[in-house]
């Protein structure tokens, strides 16, 4: 299989076929992020022949076990949804060619990736099986989004995710607890809940901000430009987010960065 560097996937994609179609991140400017520092370039697309070779390899392995029932494929890379719709549709066709039982295709997406697609293209992608995208919105706090160089504003989250709603593409959010900084976390949580309450995420996964010495954010802290939240502040922030969410959604803070695992179905309606 053509995997480049560390392979990242959401916990709920554990049983999906992991197919690399991109490597690295087109944005690669978020101050807190070091996920793709182990690859020697910013971003590249996988050649279609590599993608097909990987599908052939998986099919061959499955044949040995008399099992080729792939039902979901997760495209590997920081933001494969940035690819042109024509290429994403080609990838979907290849998956269907080798695994006709495949029902849906997921991937990581930036908010800005959705903005690159027309309504017609989003509808085509929906029909081709693209669904349950994972979007690292991180927060609805505009000050934090700007400081961390996320490349979009909170209003863009609403605009682009409503476009997904309109064509029937579901989506999940990643929230980054602690991204607002000390003294600002609970307000950031309220801002995020306000955004989420206007949308229809299927899952909200919360991770605790972890600051690595090789990150740009670490340098900002050393310069006195930003102060991190205490662990108690982070859990108060998380509590505030849950308190203000008013939509039916699966909420989970169960990754390795969360000292206290939390998961529950929030059965609420606006």
Regions found by a protein language model. Give the residues of each.
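Canonical Radical SAM [4Fe-4S] cluster-binding loop centered on the CxxxCxxC motif
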Residues: 6-53, 57
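Conserved, mostly hydrophobic/aromatic
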Residues: 25, 33, 51, 75, ...
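Short, small-residue-enriched loops and turns at beta-alpha junctions
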Residues: 80-83, 111-115, 179-184, 212, ...
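Conserved small/polar residues in nucleotide/adenosyl-binding loops
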Residues: 270
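Conserved SAM/AdoMet-binding glycine-rich loop
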Residues: 59-166, 170
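A short acidic, helix-capping loop that chelates divalent metal ions and anchors anionic groups
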Residues: 41, 141-147, 216, 260-262
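Conserved C-terminal portion of the radical SAM core fold
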Residues: 132, 155-217, 232-255
């Amino acid at each position: 299989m053509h995997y480049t560097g560390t392979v990242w996937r959401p916990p709920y994609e554990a049983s999906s076929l992991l197919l690399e179609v991109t490597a690295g991140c087109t944005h690669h400017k978020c101050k807190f992020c070091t996920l793709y520092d182990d690859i020697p370039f910013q971003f590249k697309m996988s050649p279609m022949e590599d993608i097909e070779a990987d599908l052939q390899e998986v099919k061959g392995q499955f044949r040995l076990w008399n099992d080729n029932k792939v039902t979901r494929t997760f495209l590997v890379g920081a933001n494969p949804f940035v690819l042109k719709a024509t290429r994403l549709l080609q990838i979907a066709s290849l998956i269907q060619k080798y695994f006709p039982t495949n029902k849906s295709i997921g991937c990581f997406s930036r908010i800005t990736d959705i903005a690159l697609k027309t309504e017609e293209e989003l509808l085509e992608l929906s029909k081709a099986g693209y669904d349950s995208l994972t979007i690292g919105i991180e927060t609805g706090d505009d000050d934090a989004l700007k400081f961390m160089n996320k490349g979009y504003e909170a209003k863009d989250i609403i605009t682009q995710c409503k476009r997904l709603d309109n064509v029937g593409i579901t989506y999940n959010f990643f929230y980054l607890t602690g991204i607002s900084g000390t003294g600002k976390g609970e307000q950031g949580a309220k801002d995020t809940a306000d955004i989420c309450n206007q949308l229809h995420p299927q899952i909200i996964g919360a991770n605790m901000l972890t600051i690595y010495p090789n990150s740009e954010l670490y340098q900002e802290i050393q310069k006195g430009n930003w102060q991190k939240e205490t662990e108690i502040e982070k859990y108060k922030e998380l509590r505030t987010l849950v308190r203000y969410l008013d939509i039916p959604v699966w909420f989970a803070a169960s990754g390795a960065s969360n000292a206290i695992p939390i998961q529950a179905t929030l059965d609420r309606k606006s």
